[in-house]
């Protein structure tokens, strides 16, 4: 995708339901798929609030409308569960800021898709685990997410990236890549390739269990934006 222009960003900002006066906007985070910006607004008597504005990568996610339908469906479900459990839905799940037309996304004049979320303050994200405690807390969060969504109708989610979690298809593509060896690098990783090929049966087991209806569909943090993933 082409770099985001100042004009594009201004257009997107003008088409979301923001309150207050914009005092700052700048690129944010270390993500490499979508283009993310932090916006800071000044609101009388409330001080400054932060929101996230993001241009969605339609190359990586070719069905952005379905992506946002998945997100709004799951986050709405989560909010109800979090409130029932006495939690704080402003901090414990994403909160989508709608566009001025009420949709959870905006399409700019160039055809790019944008979305916006409330910024979660006093929170940290990590590209790499720095200590065991961080890994533990991520597992706790993952488990809590799974628990809250255990009765979510996962079959209602759109599969916006075809066969993304189909391990049989992934393995077939891997073997095809090894055979073609377009870049001539297979010989340098023969040990690693052999390690993977010897475990093809393991790679297929979840898909086969799903085919036999032995494994229910579930939503996961890495997949609810675009598809369902079989997991216990």
PLM features: what roles do these ranges have?
Residues 39-44:
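Active-site beta-strand termini and strand-to-loop segments that position acidic
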């Amino acid at each position: 995708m082409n770099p985001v222009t100042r004009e594009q960003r201004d257009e997107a900002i003008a088409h979301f339901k923001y309150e207050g006066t914009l005092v700052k906007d700048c690129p944010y985070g270390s993500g490499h798929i979508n283009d993310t910006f932090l916006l800071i607004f000044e609101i009388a008597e409330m001080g400054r609030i932060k929101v996230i504005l993001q241009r969605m990568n339609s190359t990586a996610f070719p069905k952005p409308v379905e992506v946002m339908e998945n997100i709004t469906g799951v986050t709405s479900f989560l909010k109800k569960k979090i409130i029932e459990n006495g939690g704080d839905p402003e901090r414990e799940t994403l909160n989508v800021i709608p566009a001025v037309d009420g949709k959870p996304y905006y399409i700019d004049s160039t055809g790019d898709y944008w979305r916006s979320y409330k910024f979660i303050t006093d929170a940290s994200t990590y590209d790499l685990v720095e200590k065991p405690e961080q890994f533990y807390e991520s597992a706790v969060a993952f488990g809590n997410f799974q628990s809250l969504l255990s009765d979510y109708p996962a079959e209602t989610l759109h599969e916006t990236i075809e066969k993304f979690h189909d391990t049989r298809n992934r393995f077939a593509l891997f073997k095809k890549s090894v055979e073609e060896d377009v870049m001539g690098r297979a010989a340098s990783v023969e040990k690693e390739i052999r390690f993977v090929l010897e475990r093809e049966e393991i790679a297929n087991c979840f898909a086969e269990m799903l085919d036999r209806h032995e494994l229910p569909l579930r939503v996961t943090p890495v997949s609810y934006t675009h598809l369902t993933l079989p997991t216990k």
